[in-house]
Amino acid sequence: MTDVKKNENMTFEEAMKKLEEIVEKLEEGNVPLEEAIAFFQEGMKLSKLCHDKLQHVEKQLEYMLREDGELVPFSPEEE
């Protein structure tokens, strides 16, 4: 199974955990350049996966609200 297929089957939480691990490794700063590039590429794929999963959930929530006759567009609160 390729890394892409593995990533597609990950849950949001698994992808976030793996992304956090990659960030920690890169922040340590003692990773060889080639390995750092590979980590960065994997991190970008995981970031996109998480973003796509969040967008999917957002659309599901908007659809559920529409079924109840009320549509409130998703708008994240600013912290």
Curated annotation (Swiss-Prot):
GO biological process, alphabetically ordered: DNA catabolic process
Instruction: Tell where it localizes.
Output: Cytoplasm
User: Chief localization class?
Assistant: cytoplasm
What are the alphabetically sorted keywords of the record? Answer: Cytoplasm, Exonuclease, Hydrolase, Nuclease
The EC class name is hydrolase
Molecular function (Gene Ontology), one example: exodeoxyribonuclease VII activity
User: Which EC numbers characterise this protein's activity in its record?
Assistant: 3.1.11.6
Sequence intervals crossing the membrane: none
Q: Which residue positions does the secretion signal occupy?
A: none
Q: Which Gene Ontology cellular component annotation is one that this UniProt entry carries?
A: cytosol
One matching Pfam family is Exonuc_VII_S
Write out the catalysed reaction.
Answer: Exonucleolytic cleavage in either 5'- to 3'- or 3'- to 5'-direction to yield nucleoside 5'-phosphates
Q: What does this protein do?
A: Bidirectionally degrades single-stranded DNA into large acid-insoluble oligonucleotides, which are then degraded further into small acid-soluble oligonucleotides.
In the record, the note on similarity to other proteins reads: Belongs to the XseB family.
Subunit details: Heterooligomer composed of large and small subunits.
The name on file for this protein is Exodeoxyribonuclease 7 small subunit
Q: Which organism is it from?
A: Geobacillus kaustophilus (strain HTA426)
Instruction: Please state the gene responsible for encoding this protein.
Output: xseB
